[in-house]
């Protein structure tokens, strides 16, 4: 059995009584107080996440921008220094290798943040596409710890530890500066549907930073949050999860991410396949579902219409915010009308669900 990797915060999680699980080869906290309580804390106050398992790849060289324009579906030329962009990274068939964040330091220097379980695969994929480009790629994942402070009180809490004016960091922008005396990269990003920040710092400083944020945020009710609530939070906000809404056999267009696929851009990997799919119309569409009958629709459960299998669930859970069982499913567009009823097959039994708008939660303001 392969030994599980641990983040620099493993001892903090263990001491806090977190329930630890294997997540993509990492021993990570799935919950502390409980998923529902943690979920509600992030929606109403603030939560602190250990996301140090995420991968970071540094890209340098005079062809850096040209390489990213070829590698990714989004138009990286649109972002400025200190700005961040989300993009799928596709195969030539249009399937998704991964979805990632691009941090631009300069035209010749970027940081790419990828999903934990995909880090090695992504790095190998990038290297394989790099031929002919004057660039260097380095897997820097071991050099960064990453904390995410999310929720309506996130800015107020983090501001106590830095002289930087956090209100000046706009959504999907970042700055370098000191937090509690440690030089960090701070970005206004997150995976919860709430306002918040992601803090990149040297691993040796992560345990103290974790403890300090929980300490100074105590009066605002900040709580440590596990991966269980991270999943229900992202799911309510319709943020895709690789392996569920995205994968080698699901295109960004099918997943409803057409906004991040710039087909007018010059040649990029997957352009031909995605252009053809757009012209022809997507064969499948991601829809929101609410359970009419009792049951939770889990990932990969079949979806049927009048006894005929038409698709499958990508993600499903109880929604603490809406107080009902909801899901996302991938089905042919002809079945995708709002209000249409479908059957989810749960342990061999057909359980009724209704199609609803898939953005289950959007924060106010």
Curated annotation (Swiss-Prot):
<dbReference type="InterPro" id="IPR029043">
    <property type="entry name" value="GcvT/YgfZ_C"/>
</dbReference>
<comment type="function">
    <text>The glycine cleavage system catalyzes the degradation of glycine.</text>
</comment>
<dbReference type="GO" id="GO:0019464">
    <property type="term" value="P:glycine decarboxylation via glycine cleavage system"/>
</dbReference>
<dbReference type="InterPro" id="IPR013977">
    <property type="entry name" value="GCST_C"/>
</dbReference>
<dbReference type="Pfam" id="PF08669">
    <property type="entry name" value="GCV_T_C"/>
</dbReference>
<dbReference type="GO" id="GO:0005829">
    <property type="term" value="C:cytosol"/>
</dbReference>
<dbReference type="InterPro" id="IPR022903">
    <property type="entry name" value="GCS_T_bac"/>
</dbReference>
<dbReference type="InterPro" id="IPR027266">
    <property type="entry name" value="TrmE/GcvT_dom1"/>
</dbReference>
<dbReference type="InterPro" id="IPR006223">
    <property type="entry name" value="GCS_T"/>
</dbReference>
<dbReference type="GO" id="GO:0005960">
    <property type="term" value="C:glycine cleavage complex"/>
</dbReference>
<dbReference type="GO" id="GO:0008483">
    <property type="term" value="F:transaminase activity"/>
</dbReference>
<keyword id="KW-0808">Transferase</keyword>
<protein>
    <recommendedName>
        <fullName>Aminomethyltransferase</fullName>
        <ecNumber>2.1.2.10</ecNumber>
    </recommendedName>
</protein>
<keyword id="KW-0032">Aminotransferase</keyword>
<comment type="similarity">
    <text>Belongs to the GcvT family.</text>
</comment>
<dbReference type="InterPro" id="IPR006222">
    <property type="entry name" value="GCV_T_N"/>
</dbReference>
<dbReference type="Pfam" id="PF01571">
    <property type="entry name" value="GCV_T"/>
</dbReference>
<dbReference type="GO" id="GO:0004047">
    <property type="term" value="F:aminomethyltransferase activity"/>
</dbReference>
<comment type="subunit">
    <text>The glycine cleavage system is composed of four proteins: P, T, L and H.</text>
</comment>
<dbReference type="InterPro" id="IPR028896">
    <property type="entry name" value="GcvT/YgfZ/DmdA"/>
</dbReference>
